[in-house]
UniProtKB/Swiss-Prot annotation:
Chaperone found in the keyword field: no
Record protein name field: Zinc finger protein 36
Its biological purpose: Probable transcription factor involved in abscisic acid (ABA) signaling. Required for the regulation of the cross-talk between NADPH oxidase, hydrogen peroxide and MAP kinase in ABA signaling. Regulates the expression of the NADPH oxidase genes RBOHB and RBOHE, and the MAPK genes MPK1, MPK4, MPK5, MPK7 and MPK14. Regulates ABA-induced hydrogen peroxide production and antioxidant defense. Required for tolerance to water stress and oxidative stress.
InterPro entries, per database record: AZF1/2/3-like, Znf_C2H2_sf, Znf_C2H2_type
Highest rank taxon of the organism: Eukaryota
SUPFAM superfamilies: beta-beta-alpha zinc fingers
Gene designation per UniProt: ZFP36
């Protein structure tokens, strides 16, 4: 039975998948009893070579727990450890994954929303400053708190329904539209020629004038 049990529990035959030797009924029952004994904390079997049978049964039915793998390779990004360098490389590829187009568009939309929010805040601040700012008179440059006060003040600048600024602009336009009897593009005449021309023009005016006063001047 011992030889049959050793042949049945041979690790080389088990690893290579070799066919087990034929055993009879008594040997099979003995192997079953040995397996039951292994499950009860390795009690010794009765008979010659019982200790060897227990050790072989323990190796086959109660294998030693596998030693835990040492995690020597650690990711520098997230701190996870891996047993092999290949596993670490496969994990690091997830950190180098480029962002999807949806994420890019989402980030661009968020930036645009932030920019539009900043512009709206600036516009609201400028409009509030303009509405609460002083109202200044365009004539005397005085400032007033409200538009009604400015309108009441402007009444002092008006006489008979006309504005001082309008009258000043009208007088300036009239002065600029006055006709001058000389051309700036021509060379100036000598004083003798200019005096002779003026005297001649005066004589022609007196001759052609129908007024009696000028005729008396001609007779004199």
């Amino acid at each position: 039975m011992t030889a049959a049990l050793q042949a049945l529990l041979d690790p080389t035959a088990l690893s290579l998948g070799l066919p087990t030797p034929a055993i009879n009924k008594e040997e099979y029952l003995a192997i079953c009893l040995a397996a039951l004994a292994c499950t009860r904390a390795g009690k010794a079997l009765v008979g010659v070579g019982g200790q060897q049978q227990v050790q072989a049964c323990n190796k086959w039915l109660c294998p030693a727990p596998a030693a835990p793998e040492e995690l020597r390779f650690r990711c520098t990004v997230c701190g996870k450890a891996f047993a092999s360098y290949q596993a670490l490389g496969g994990h690091k590829s997830s950190h180098r994954k480029p962002p999807s187009p949806g994420d890019h568009y989402g980030a661009a939309a968020a930036a645009q929303q932030l920019a539009s929010a900043g512009d709206s805040k600036e516009d609201s601040a400028s409009s509030a400053a303009g509405s609460t700012g002083p109202h200044r008179c365009t004539i005397c440059r005085r400032s007033f708190a409200t538009g009604q006060a400015l309108g009441g003040h402007k009444r002092c600048h008006y006489w008979d329904g006309t504005s001082v600024s309008v009258s000043v602009s009208a007088s300036a336009s009239a002065a600029s539209s006055a006709v001058r009897n000389f051309d700036l593009n021509l060379m100036p005449l000598p004083e003798s020629t200019a005096a002779a021309g003026i005297k001649r023009w005066a004589e022609e005016e007196e001759v052609q004038s129908p007024l009696p006063v000028k005729k008396l001047r001609m007779s004199n």
